[in-house]
UniProtKB/Swiss-Prot annotation:
Keyword RNA-binding listed: no
Intracellular or extracellular location(s): Cytoplasm
PROSITE patterns: CHAPERONINS_CPN60
UniProt catalytic activity: ATP + H2O + a folded polypeptide = ADP + phosphate + an unfolded polypeptide
Protein name per UniProt: Chaperonin GroEL
UniProt GO cellular component terms: cytoplasm
Family indicated by similarity: Belongs to the chaperonin (HSP60) family.
The gene coding this protein: groEL
InterPro entries cross-referenced by the UniProt entry: Chaperonin_Cpn60_CS, Cpn60/GroEL, Cpn60/GroEL/TCP-1, GroEL-like_apical_dom_sf, GROEL-like_equatorial_sf, TCP-1-like_intermed_sf
Ligand binding (ATP): 29-32, 50, 86-90, 414, 492
PANTHER family xrefs: 60 KDA HEAT SHOCK PROTEIN, MITOCHONDRIAL
Amino acid sequence: MAKEIKFSDSARNLLFEGVRQLHDAVKVTMGPRGRNVLIQKSYGAPSITKDGVSVAKEIELSCPVANMGAQLVKEVASKTADAAGDGTTTATVLAYSIFKEGLRNITAGANPIEVKRGMDKAAEAIINELKKASKKVGGKEEITQVATISANSDHNIGKLIADAMEKVGKDGVITVEEAKGIEDELDVVEGMQFDRGYLSPYFVTNAEKMTAQLDNAYILLTDKKISSMKDILPLLEKTMKEGKPLLIIAEDIEGEALTTLVVNKLRGVLNIAAVKAPGFGDRRKEMLKDIAILTGGQVISEELGLSLENAEVEFLGKAGRIVIDKDNTTIVDGKGHSDDVKDRVAQIKTQIASTTSDYDKEKLQERLAKLSGGVAVIKVGAASEVEMKEKKDRVDDALSATKAAVEEGIVIGGGAALIRAAQKVHLNLHDDEKVGYEIIMRAIKAPLAQIAINAGYDGGVVVNEVQKHEGHFGFNASNGKYVDMFKEGIIDPLKVERIALQNAVSVSSLLLTTEATVHEIKEEKAAPAMPDMGGMGGMGGMGGMM
């Protein structure tokens, strides 16, 4: 297929047009007074969202070059959401502002490489100031505040997340699912999570979230590597008769065995998933034993005189629900005996008390938390399916952002943290590096300005007022007042601000240093030929009808 090439300003201007369209669709969702975006779905009812990344994911433009620009910034929004759980709109607004300012200077003759270097130095200095200004998340109240803001100012969601963290600990496992009624609920169930994802994406049952979910499932636990199908065929036939899903946790599953499982999963013959066993060496054996005790199963190991070929269904563990993504496996509602679990917990506590190695102690404490902490399940209620999906997305975002706040600390929210950090940065740069530095200094005002505009205020006036002051002074877009942001509970996770700025600078630098684009030329499909009308000459005789 023929390709078209665009060069320099022509290419960058088209890329900018794509970024602008994406930005214009996403920016309206920003802040406590952000607006909704209605998205048409290929099937079912349209979805309503105030989540920037959900809007970005749906955007596909007809112009191939503009679409490349939009897709690059869309990737930034997604990566920011993956890493920090929030800040997607901030990253998009920053990327657009940096690209817009940069494009104007490069078109006027600035050196893109020097400009990029200045931008990188400015961003690094601002991030260092953000870190200095951050403070650790203290109690339940601050966790509630962070979660509330990330859930688009929904206090009920903020309180649910804070309650969940209080019950399972800051490092505990919290999952989100749909409630049967319209009320939100919080349940704590016995469960465990370990850091191994599915061995093949073909095991996925939810394509949108890329997760595999197995309900009322059997669990096969073995410390053996499975490479031949004949090893597990007898056991598979027995579980198929029971009609229940199966999760295989083994040292590894490869070759013919994995291929056969995937093919049978795709054909609908087996409802199955497979993951590698967590840990290494002796720790792996102990962790397999932990899972076995939690689920009421038995580790099939040759050391115990057990083989896969002769294994019975009674050896399998059982769980009410298993959720697997590309990185983690969560087992909820294991069917093991509570007394066995308590004995195992006591055994691990004894090992913690007797070990002298800090590393071993840390790993034992991780195992203890997995066994005894349980899994908090936030059940989201809503009156309609559209509302349910929108609310569930908000809870997921708020949960990730809250974990980010606990991890790295918090800064003042409402777009003010970037401005405060920038006020303390003074770099002595020259020529086009200075141009890059000034681009960042202007662009970091954009998030606050956009929050104010969405709330019905003049963005420029609000930014100027905030810049006149120092400390925690900022703008509360909910009521239009200038307040102490920490006292009002308007806070953002440092990680969200940091990653949003880093990703925005990264993608803007790529776009500004792009000198050519290559894309396929869409071939126009020829219109279908008109049918031959030769045999219809007799129609001329219809003239007498006049």
